[in-house]
Curated annotation (Swiss-Prot):
Name of the featured protein: Pectin lyase 2
Enzyme type, top EC level: lyase
Any single Gene Ontology cellular-component annotation: extracellular region
Organism in which the protein naturally occurs: Aspergillus oryzae (strain ATCC 42149 / RIB 40) (Yellow koji mold)
Primary localization class, coarse: secreted
E.C. number(s) listed in UniProt: 4.2.2.10
Keywords carried by this UniProt record: Carbohydrate metabolism, Cell wall biogenesis/degradation, Disulfide bond, Glycoprotein, Lyase, Polysaccharide degradation, Secreted, Signal
Subcellular location: Secreted
Family: Belongs to the polysaccharide lyase 1 family.
Residues spanning the signal sequence: 1-19
Length: 375
């Protein structure tokens, strides 16, 4: 009887492993990402196992079925930081990372900061990995993920990354991509993050798709001191093609996204809800095609004062898109929000011949479809 029970358990575990895998395929620029492919799934049970699986050289399908809490695993640091945005209880304060306070905010009041060291640098993710959450169980708390230094072919789907030193700017990012290729992030929830929810660094990040993610900006602390997170999506690569489709931006106040460097961004069917400052910030080298997006209660859909890039988002010229991407563009929708009007046709030429995501009519669907647990 005991032998039979063991066999039953082994068979169940094997069936579970074989049944695990990525749901669907990416749209847009990272459409050929396969991650860990058909590798037999592994189920880490400790933070050390998770770090090992993500960082080794094997193609892997890694399934998260619990919370991995990195808080206090690397100790804490208490030192002097600064308060550039005010000393109110709802204001973020800054760590003096790389002498940032000293060099850039020397006139800001000094303040004592105590932060968790684990959040400062994310977990290294190597090539050919699929990181998948089981239901709503897969959570990484207190530490982010880093896809950097030549890594390629990574899929992250249906997990949550949360609680990375939310009081402290420079306290850590949720997902960092820098000098990488073929990265698909899908149905991921990020919440209560000190710095960026997503950051694509200054090296070439090539082909990236961010789809159906929930950027939850609600926080007790923010740089705008109003419970709306300012640091959200920062796209700064030297040769980047990014598809951003079906994402839900909630309670943000800026950099949602910030686009510059040499970045082609196709922003399609996203939903911005309750933004107290601005959504898009388009700097030099940012080329944005924005269509089928919904803006509700967004003070400014784009920040005019910093605009140095190029934008096509015109509903009146939507048919112009046909000559470049093979179909008319979808109109953006605005409710109690600033407008997003850009007619730079040169942007469309950047997307000609590229793998461009499909577009639906603008809607609020991402509010119920995006993030962990909504596959």
């Amino acid at each position: 009887m005991k032998y039979a029970a063991v066999l039953t358990t082994v068979a169940a575990l094997a069936s579970r492993a074989l049944g695990a895998g990525v749901s669907g395929t990416a749209e847009g620029f990272a459409s050929s990402a396969t991650g860990g492919g058909s590798a037999t799934a592994v189920y880490p049970t400790t933070t050390d196992e998770l770090v090992s699986y993500l960082g080794d050289d094997e193609a892997r399908v890694i399934v998260l079925s619990q919370t991995f809490d990195f808080t206090n695993t690397e100790g804490t640091t208490t030192e002097t930081g600064c308060a550039p945005w005010g000393t109110g209880s709802a204001c973020q304060v800054a760590i003096n990372k790389d002498d940032w306070c000293t060099n850039y905010e020397s006139s800001a009041p000094s303040t004592s900061v105590t932060y968790d060291n684990a959040g400062s640098l994310g977990i290294t993710v190597n090539s050919n990995k699929s990181l998948i959450g089981e239901g709503t169980k897969g959570v990484i708390k207190g530490k982010g993920l880093r896809i950097v230094n030549g890594v390629e072919n990574v899929i992250i789907q249906n997990i949550a990354v949360t609680d990375i030193n939310p009081k402290y700017v420079w306290g850590g990012d949720a997902i960092t991509i820098n000098q990488a290729d073929l990265v698909w992030i899908d149905h991921v929830t990020t919440a209560r993050i000190g710095r960026q929810h997503y950051v694509l660094g200054t090296e070439a990040d090539n082909r990236v798709t961010l789809s159906n993610n929930y950027i939850d900006g609600e926080s007790d602390y923010s740089a705008t001191c109003d419970g709306h997170h300012y640091w959200n999506v920062y796209l700064d690569g030297s040769s980047d093609k990014v598809t951003m489709k079906g994402n839900y931006f909630y309670k943000t106040s800026g950099r949602a996204p910030k686009v510059q460097g040499n970045t082609y961004l196709h922003a399609v069917n996203n939903y911005w809800n309750d933004n107290s400052n601005h959504a898009f910030e388009i700097g030099s080298g940012g080329y944005v095609l924005a269509e089928g997006n919904t803006f509700a209660d967004v003070t400014a859909a784009v920040e005019d004062s910093s605009f140095e890039g190029e934008l096509f988002s015109s509903s009146s010229d939507a048919d112009t898109c046909s000559s470049y991407i093979g179909r008319a563009c979808k109109a953006n929708s605005f409710t109690n929000s600033g407008d997003l009007s850009g007619t730079t046709v040169d942007v469309l030429s950047k997307f000609k011949g590229e793998t461009v995501a499909t577009a639906d009519t603008a809607s609020t669907a991402p509010a119920s479809n995006a993030g962990q647990g909504n596959l």
